[in-house]
């Protein structure tokens, strides 16, 4: 993992077309601004993990009944 230090207002580039800017730092939280093409999906990791967990629980609760054909 690459770890960088940035101050408010400073930007880093990911590839040629994604800009990540530190917008603010307050009470231990960092606010980030992200400029990226519309086809780049940006999601918070905790939401992805929550959705994956819910999908796994739903899949486990499904019961498939196999019926023999006569």
From Swiss-Prot:
GO terms for biological process: mRNA catabolic process; negative regulation of translational initiation; positive regulation of translational initiation; regulation of carbohydrate metabolic process. Keywords: Activator, Cytoplasm, Repressor, RNA-binding, Translation regulation. Its main location: cytoplasm. GO terms for cellular component: cytosol. The lineage of its organism: Bacteria, Pseudomonadati, Pseudomonadota, Gammaproteobacteria, Thiotrichales. Homodimer; the beta-strands of each monomer intercalate to form a hydrophobic core, while the alpha-helices form wings that extend away from the core. It is found in: Cytoplasm. A key translational regulator that binds mRNA to regulate translation initiation and/or mRNA stability. Mediates global changes in gene expression, shifting from rapid growth to stress survival by linking envelope stress, the stringent response and the catabolite repression systems. Usually binds in the 5'-UTR; binding at or near the Shine-Dalgarno sequence prevents ribosome-binding, repressing translation, binding elsewhere in the 5'-UTR can activate translation and/or stabilize the mRNA. Its function is antagonized by small RNA(s). GO terms for molecular function: mRNA 5'-UTR binding. It comes from Hydrogenovibrio crunogenus (strain DSM 25203 / XCL-2) (Thiomicrospira crunogena). Belongs to the CsrA/RsmA family. This is Translational regulator CsrA. NCBIfam families: csrA, PRK01712.1. Transmembrane segments: none annotated.
């Amino acid at each position: 993992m690459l770890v960088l230090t940035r101050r408010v207002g400073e930007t880093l580039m990911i590839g040629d077309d994604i800009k990540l800017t530190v917008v603010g730092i307050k009470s231990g939280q960092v606010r980030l601004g992200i400029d990226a093409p519309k086809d780049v999906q940006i999601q918070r990791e905790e939401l992805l993990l929550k959705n994956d967990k819910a999908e796994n629980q739903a899949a486990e609760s499904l019961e498939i009944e196999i019926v023999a054909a006569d």
